[in-house]
Amino acid sequence: MSFQEQQCKQPCQPPPVCPPPKCPEPCPLPKCPEPCPPPKCPEPCPEPCLPSPCQQKCPPVQTPPPCQQKCPPKSK
């Protein structure tokens, strides 16, 4: 058996690990030509609606009882 035949029967070796590709220099971060202005509202937001004073002060409206209960019975 020749030397080449012995090499042929040996298991194949894994290929060498390639180093990760390197950039020649780090990529620069994207730059804005000027800082972005903060978003502006066309006008200030309206305040949330508050209940009117009457709703806070007045008691809930009660339906009046029927007239038959208010009026005294007719006397003959």
Curated annotation (Swiss-Prot):
Q: Which domain of life does this protein belong to?
A: Eukaryota
Q: What induces this one?
A: Up-regulated by estrogen in the uterus of ovariectomized animals, with strongly increased expression detected in luminal epithelial cells at 6 and 12 hours after hormone injection.
Pfam families xref list? SPRR2
Record GO cellular component, one term = nucleus
Tissue expression as described in the entry? Expressed in uterus.
Q: Cite the residue spans of the region called 3 X 9 AA approximate tandem repeats.
A: 21-47
**Sorted alphabetically, which InterPro entries does this protein's record hold?**
SPRR2
Which controlled-vocabulary keywords does the entry list? Cytoplasm, Keratinization, Repeat
Q: Where in the cell is it found?
A: Cytoplasm
* BP GO terms, sorted: epidermis development; keratinization; keratinocyte differentiation; response to estradiol
Where are the annotated segments for Disordered?
55-76
Cited function: Cross-linked envelope protein of keratinocytes. It is a keratinocyte protein that first appears in the cell cytosol, but ultimately becomes cross-linked to membrane proteins by transglutaminase. All that results in the formation of an insoluble envelope beneath the plasma membrane.
Would you identify the family this protein belongs to, as annotated? Belongs to the cornifin (SPRR) family.
Q: What is this protein called?
A: Small proline-rich protein 2G
Q: List the source organism.
A: Mus musculus (Mouse)
Q: Which gene encodes it?
A: Sprr2g
